[in-house]
Amino acid sequence: MDKISAPFFSGTSPAAASVAGVDEDDRLCFQAQELMFAYNISMVLRAAIQLGLLDALSAAGGKALTPNELVENVETSSNKAEAAAAVDRILRYLSCFNVVTCSSEAAGPDGTLVRRYTTGPLCRWLTKDRGDGTLSPFAVFVVDPDHLFPWHHIAEAVTAGGPSAFERTQKWPYYEYMGKNQRLGTLFDNAMAQHSVILVTKMLERFKGFDGVQRLVDVGGGTGSTLGMITSKYKHMTGINYDLPHVIAQGLPLPGVEHVAGDMYESIPTGDAVLLQWITLMLNDDEFVKILSNCHNALPKDGKVIVVDGILPENPDSSLTARDAFTLDIIMFVLFKGAKQRTEKEFARLAKQAGFTGGIKKTYIFFNFYALEFTK
């Protein structure tokens, strides 16, 4: 896949570019300041989603709305004029990042500007699910205070060693904590479910590796929604949704899908293909090889594992695709001890170590995700 240029934080600050006489020193200072305040966009985006502003603009069907019109459906204890002024400031900020589009016109004898807003290019992925997934639950989840707290302890994780920053601060491994914090766990489940809809929808369009598969085992498949999407297209296929007992207890009744409880570190049900979707980056190398070895034992001759995950570039650069990959890698560093994104060479080495000698076939899916087929 070709590298995609970054729309902002790209080395040429949009703010700096609009000011006459900006020299190189100015430009670098602008860029450093943008990095300092990068959290702003995530937090303001979360607020806009929670307030329903982006959904309201989407529902308007292209009609430009004023802040006064938008706050009519926002429950607030403040007066509407005050709320409208706050909404205006939120949306004009988001318009700087192509989330919404802003237009203005003079109104009244004093020439006061009235701004109107419509959806911007990025709203496509940040409004309510239209059947092909949305990132809005993820945008709310990732900056939730309970999820964000460990990020204040990255330096401590480096100097002290031992557990990840998340486990150090929250006192439990990531998934165990999600089970104990039901509020955050629900946000996490919703975020992952919608992310999976996006990914699997694109995978079914672009990936042909399920052709001929009769029995597909989805390891860590959650409630089975991914398998349900796959088996709805591949009617001949039987899907085995494999996850921990408390997860399988919430399994969805889906045609062609059988729910099986177990532990992927112990064994994996037999099938002619095994799917590992967005799991491998959460594993250290020893865990990854252990699970791949269990997959190898569950497969017939010429069976395959399908890993759906990102691929880390050999070297970092400023492209959007590289930044995305290294962003996920640093997220794994904060959340899980030893977990990481991997280069294609690292995938190949670990697959061979687990007994897969048939090589790797790579297919690009969508937003930096690939399907990697390891053949036995």
Swiss-Prot record:
Tissue expression profile of the protein: More present in the fifth leaf than in the second leaf (at protein level).
Swiss-Prot/TrEMBL GO biological process terms: biosynthetic process; methylation; response to jasmonic acid; response to temperature stimulus
Catalytic activity field: 3-(aminomethyl)indole + 2 S-adenosyl-L-methionine = gramine + 2 S-adenosyl-L-homocysteine + 2 H(+)
UniProt KW Signal keyword: no
Highest taxon, organism lineage: Eukaryota
The UniProt record lists the keyword Cell inner membrane: no
EC number: 2.1.1.340
Parts forming coiled coils: none
Signal peptide segment: none
Induction of synthesis: Induced by jasmonic acid. Triggered by high temperatures; 35 degrees Celsius day/30 degrees Celsius night (at protein level).
UniProt-listed PROSITE patterns: SAM_OMT_II (PS51683)
GO molecular function, one term: S-adenosylmethionine-dependent methyltransferase activity
Regulation: Repressed by sodium carbonate, sodium bicarbonate and K-phosphate.
Activity response to pH changes: Optimum pH is 9.
UniProt keyword terms in alphabetical order: Methyltransferase, S-adenosyl-L-methionine, Transferase
Sequence positions that bind S-adenosyl-L-homocysteine: G220, D243, D263, M264
Additional detail: Present and expressed only in cultivars containing gramine (e.g. cv. 5172-28:4, cv. 5172-39:9, cv. 5175-50:20, cv. Hordeum vulgare ssp. spontaneum accession 5, cv. Golf, cv. Lina, cv. Barke, cv. Sultan5, cv. Igri, cv. Salome and cv. Osiris) but not detected in cv. CI 16145, cv. CI 11506, cv. Mona, cv. Morex and cv. Maythorpe.
Function summary: Methylates 3-aminomethylindole (AMI) and N-methyl-3-aminomethylindole (MAMI), two substrates involved in gramine biosynthesis, a toxic indole alkaloid. Can use S-adenosyl-L-methionine (AdoMet) as a methyl donor. Unable to mediate caffeic acid O-methylation.
Family of this protein: Belongs to the class I-like SAM-binding methyltransferase superfamily. Cation-independent O-methyltransferase family.
Protein name in the entry: 3-aminomethylindole N-methyltransferase
Organism, scientific name: Hordeum vulgare subsp. vulgare (Domesticated barley)
Lineage: Eukaryota, Viridiplantae, Streptophyta, Embryophyta, Tracheophyta
